[in-house]
């Protein structure tokens, strides 16, 4: 393995909007896309895309968002994945409102990654 990434994986819901909402307003999304995100998963994916071998340590909840990102985590890291499933946890997720010029507004829920303790990590990954 060339690089080990430890941290958040999340389900992202991206919505293309004409402008971000102001308080007490409802706006329409022009287009939506679901994807896998989170700092650690995004960095690991970029590293692997550049030809590196990436390992990933992250956590998900036993929920639908966790099921969504599990396959992406396995694709990114393969056998170099330590994926903690926290039965009472909630998987990290973000709603990202993107304007046509690329400006964005992110609402993020951190999920259960903070429930992982150093003693749980595998010595060899």
What are these regions (language model features)?
Residues 1-59, 64-68:
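Glycine-rich phosphate/adenosyl-contacting loop at the front of the ribokinase-like
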Residues 25-26, 49-125:
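Conserved N-terminal subdomain of the carbohydrate kinase-like
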């Amino acid at each position: 393995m060339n690089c080990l990434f430890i941290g958040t994986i999340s389900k992202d819901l991206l919505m293309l909007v004409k402008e971000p909402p102001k308080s007490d307003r409802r706006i329409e999304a022009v287009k939506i896309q679901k994807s896998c995100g989170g700092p650690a998963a995004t960095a690991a994916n970029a590293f692997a895309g550049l030809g590196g071998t990436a390992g990933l340590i992250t956590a998900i909840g036993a929920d639908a968002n966790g099921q969504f990102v599990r396959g992406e985590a396995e694709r990114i890291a393969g056998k170099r994945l330590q994926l903690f499933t926290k039965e009472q946890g909630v998987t990290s997720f973000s709603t990202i409102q993107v304007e046509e010029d690329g400006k964005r507004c992110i609402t993020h829920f951190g999920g259960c990654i903070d429930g992982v303790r150093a003693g749980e990590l595998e010595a060899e990954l």
